[in-house]
């Protein structure tokens, strides 16, 4: 399948399901990430929550980020590796969220953020010189990626919305590990970026260990 069409289908499916969630509160509640329900055996929520969003702004940000970063990943690795990294990042995000909030039975979250963060990390690893245009200003993509995760630390500490900030970190870890797994030459080709992108992950791990998240 044409890679661009492949991406458009993924975005379209996410948009359709998200809008269904906007309009149908029962549907939204049934498929969102919810600790109590997952611990009762509804593990499908760890995947379906990645197709739901809090509002149009949340959906638009994730889909635009995916649209801009995904071509680097499927362009370098192909459609199947792109899908592997996307869903591995989504699942890693859900697993980390479940681990950190396992005793909070009422904790809930939604969003493709974990999967998208994994794709962002993957794209930066594959193309360290990648730049994005933010408010008409070109900035290095790795600064965007690190800033995105640092913002996630704030969101995890604030806990004032329904967005899966914890999933951002799990997604970053998934994207990082699976990109190296499918393209291990990157360890030698882009060693500096491989090291740089561990910084926010290490910060989060230390804060979690100290009980600050």
Protein language model regions, located:
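A detector for small-residue-rich transmembrane helices and their helix-helix packing motifs
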Residues: 1-213
């Amino acid at each position: 399948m044409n890679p661009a069409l492949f991406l458009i289908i993924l975005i379209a499916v996410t948009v359709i399901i998200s809008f269904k969630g906007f309009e149908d509160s029962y549907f939204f509640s049934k498929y969102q990430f919810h600790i109590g329900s997952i611990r009762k055996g509804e593990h499908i929520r760890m995947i379906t929550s990645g197709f739901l969003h809090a509002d149009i702004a949340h959906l638009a940000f994730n889909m635009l980020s995916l649209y801009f970063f995904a071509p680097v990943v499927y362009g370098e690795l192909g459609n199947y590796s792109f899908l592997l990294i996307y869903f591995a990042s989504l699942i890693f995000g859900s697993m980390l969220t479940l681990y950190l909030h396992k005793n909070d039975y009422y904790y809930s979250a939604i969003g493709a953020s974990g999967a998208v963060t994994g794709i962002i990390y993957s794209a930066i690893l594959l193309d360290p010189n990648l730049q994005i245009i933010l408010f008409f200003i070109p900035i290095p993509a790795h600064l965007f990626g690190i800033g995105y995760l640092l913002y996630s630390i704030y969101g995890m500490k604030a806990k004032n919305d329904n967005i899966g900030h914890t999933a951002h970190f799990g997604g970053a870890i998934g994207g990082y590990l699976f990109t190296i797994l499918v393209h291990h030459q990157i360890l030698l080709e882009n060693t500096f970026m491989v090291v740089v992108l561990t910084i926010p992950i290490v910060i989060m791990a230390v804060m979690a260990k100290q009980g600050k998240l």
